[in-house]
């Protein structure tokens, strides 16, 4: 599509009215988007002002541009939000079966959203404006309170989201199923539950985003060829949480900072748990192999543990590589790669990394673990690193620092076939 021939339309031309909380502008905005698409595509402008709206539908080859000072604010009426409508089979992405956290794309309560992109391509949203999810609660939603997602994508490709902000999401800021060749760039997400949650992705990138979320900042799984780069991540749960196996994932130059600035809605906590949590099968069956996970030049500050890998019984793992990881004020939970059953990891490579832990000054800890089953452990019997069911662990120029006292051993290997290299220990 030629930029010289593309259409530029304002939502004002279709009857949108700013700064009036009693008006639902969804009809006007959707007419503008539809008209732009019918004319071959282009840009739909949202001028400065606050526009209250229910569900909006993106179309192929149309960019929704939020001008400076423009705010799309979700309607306060739950009835103004539609559920996802699609013929796609998304059942493999269901999770939390049998719990209050069960979610399914076919559930009309779970799949409500403010902005939809379904089966479209070459479309997206750009700033520098703002989207306000309005924190609309739904007593029939997950945990009996979660409301509509702010943006929901399904079966989309070649999408671009950049240079805008999202606040007060009533559930996830962005939820996506089966997307490809999609970019999330320079987004600022504040509050709500998960920030960007993608289930099923091929060739996506998340870069230069700033996330201050109550739940996991970035999450999902079944990713291939995914890049997460130069993001600032602050969470009252986990920074990055992969709950389904993925391959060729590159996480680089991200900074993880705790505690969270926005409390977790359910528990009220603000402590950041794991910087990067790779947990296929953690929220229900998610069979498959996780492989080629590369973590490079990331910084962790004031989190419980920097990296955790836990395989489910239906999973295996190939290579997990960690390079130039820096950690400061890490809690008393060791970096770990393990499975509690027999699921194997082929190799873990950790290089050029420097992690400082806060010690747990308790003489009785080493003996406490004797005879205890794994599910009774509140943390690991080692303070720095813990490996279980790994074929090969390679350590090169790794320094583990201990602030304070801790009587546990620094590193523990359980059912590890080969260990190459060692870590340098530095204690107070």
Predicted regions mapped to residue ranges:
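Extracellular/periplasmic carbohydrate-active domains that bind, remodel
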Residues: 5-428
